[in-house]
Amino acid sequence: MYLVTAAEMGQLDRLASSEYMIPSIVLMENAGLRVVESIERHFQGQVANRRILIFCGKGNNGGDGLVVARHLLNRGAEVKVFLLARPEDIRGDARTNLEIYQKMGGKLLLLLGESHLQRADIALLYADLVVDAIFGTGFKGAAMGLPAAVINMINKAHRETVAVDLPSGLEADTGRCFGPCIQATWTVTFALPKLGLVVEPGASLTGRLEVADIGIPQKLVATQHFNRRLLTAAWCRSQLPRREASGHKGLYGRVLAVGGSPGLTGAITLAATAALKAGAGLVTAAVPRGVQGILAMKTTEIMTMSLPETPAGALSRDALDPLLERLAEVDVLAIGPGLSRDPATVDLVKELLPRVQVPAVVDADALNALATDTRVLTGDHGPLVLTPHPGEMARLLGTTAAKIQEDRLEIAAKYAREWQAVLLLKGARTVIAWPDGQVYINPTGNPGMATAGSGDVLTGIIAGLAGQGLKPGVAAALGAYLHGAAGDEAARQRGQRAMMAGDLLDFLPYVLRNLEEEVETIVAAGLGRD
């Protein structure tokens, strides 16, 4: 599902009118009707006699709200419109809908100053629902003055609130909120989701997101060159590797997982197990000689490979040649889980990666090794999938995690191009950037997954998918979705607070089966179905 900026959405609206002769007032009517239908579903078809307050600004978003008011009035709801502007200041299609609403006898109350707030505050005490139609996609900066006071008043009332297109006070392009912003119960956005609705903090303010068709021709959408997508179950289902009836384990990918060190054998075990559970045919865990026995006792299905080690028990520079020999026999490399930051291991990583020709999924201490010399990334290398969390990304760039979080999408996209690697930036709403400029945002996952070993599971899933022949970017995007969906299922069945990385392994097969069989149990947090 494409994600758009305010400018891109505005261009679609204009082209729908200029090239397809769809009047803008028709788009406004369709938008308002979709919100009304959503409200009807919310109340299970019973909107008659519901006390619904609609707060309208003076722009087109307010016009959408006036369409909502008209149709709810026709359906028997007790509607009050609070207008944050003088009627004579309303223009265009919004003015037309205001006049229709007034001719229908609808209640219109003006909010022109703080002295008018008391009546709205009292009405909120008895409201069944609030409709937020104050600001639209053109809003930038911070809500101030009267609009800010109204937004704060609505939030303090703690009434169920549906936002029209996006919560007022939220920037459509960035998801940032520099002043008060509506905390919506759910949001009905039009045609395509706006970027700011699916990245934090916007995603948390949006509530459940519904994407409504307002009649913009799909033929028109197909002519546009949008490079950002929201991952959906439908897209992920279409990317699943096929399992042939005549298939064998060699056909489904040979994965070499390199990592482990004293005290950190769990990380490489999780990654290797995840690769198998993601569908890989054969997985070998290559670890320091001193921990091979521990790993062999931990696992049954995973093969192990013993490698030379340093006096501290980490992988030594002498592991390079054995690894290169084994890499000639596998389809994908996963490197980093539990690897350690031993100086000899750091040197090993920097010498190994430029010589790897198969796709390599690079995580954890392998990323920390690259942070000591990023020339490995800017030089010649094979296909790479880098999977940093914000702290690891900050080390790669010599900055802070806070700076990374301020501009996650742009940073991921920039360095995916610069390093010619797939860059998966972990966090709430994980970003997957491809070297060609495409960016995917993953809606699955929850805070319970912020636990030791979760990233190791993700590394293994991606490697397992890449081993089955998926391109690195597809493997990373699909892997992120499956990883988060497994976490969501674990949260539903076991709760978030006590979640462990092993729970993700338990529920990954369940998620894969349901996705493959098109069972609609995978619903991304905050989103409706595809």
From Swiss-Prot:
The keyword Glycosyltransferase does not apply. Residues 389-395 are annotated as: NADPHX 2. One of its GO terms (molecular function) is metal ion binding. Its cofactor is K(+). Binds 1 potassium ion per subunit. PANTHER family: ATP-DEPENDENT (S)-NAD(P)H-HYDRATE DEHYDRATASE, ATP-DEPENDENT (S)-NAD(P)H-HYDRATE DEHYDRATASE FAMILY MEMBER. This is Bifunctional NAD(P)H-hydrate repair enzyme Nnr. The lineage of its organism: Bacteria, Bacillati, Bacillota, Clostridia, Moorellales. The gene is nnr.
